[in-house]
Amino acid sequence: MSEIASRVKAIIVDKLGVEESEVTETASFTNDLGADSLDTVELIMEFEKEFGISIPDDQAEKIGTVQDAVAYIEEHAK
């Protein structure tokens, strides 16, 4: 697991209060991890803060799984 993936996983565990074992690459924030729309917005904001990036709303809407988040951040983080 990459450093970015580990950090993303830690943020998800912290913000959603789920077990680390539940946070798999294919886990959906809403369907598998129980996030509502507000939780998802808070996750995106935390990813932006943690990685020093800006995620436009149209891109944020496409980030629905752990792997989606990791891939976006790996592509855009400096």
Curated annotation (Swiss-Prot):
Pathway assignment: Lipid metabolism; fatty acid biosynthesis
Post-translational modification: 4'-phosphopantetheine is transferred from CoA to a specific serine of apo-ACP by AcpS. This modification is essential for activity because fatty acids are bound in thioester linkage to the sulfhydryl of the prosthetic group.
Keyword field contains Zinc: no
Domain named Carrier: residues: 2-77
Subcellular location: Cytoplasm
Sites bearing O-(pantetheine 4'-phosphoryl)serine, chain numbering: S37
GO molecular function list: acyl binding; acyl carrier activity; phosphopantetheine binding
GO BP annotation list: lipid A biosynthetic process
SMART domains membership: PKS_PP
TM ranges: none
UniProtKB keywords: Cytoplasm, Fatty acid biosynthesis, Fatty acid metabolism, Lipid biosynthesis, Lipid metabolism, Phosphopantetheine, Phosphoprotein
Gene Ontology CC annotation, any one: membrane
Family of the protein in this entry: Belongs to the acyl carrier protein (ACP) family.
PANTHER family, per the entry: ACYL CARRIER PROTEIN (PTHR20863), CARRIER DOMAIN-CONTAINING PROTEIN (PTHR20863:SF76)
Role according to the record: Carrier of the growing fatty acid chain in fatty acid biosynthesis.
UniProt cross-references to HAMAP family, sorted A to Z: Acyl_carrier
Protein's name in the database: Acyl carrier protein
Taxonomic source organism: Bacteroides fragilis (strain ATCC 25285 / DSM 2151 / CCUG 4856 / JCM 11019 / LMG 10263 / NCTC 9343 / Onslow / VPI 2553 / EN-2)
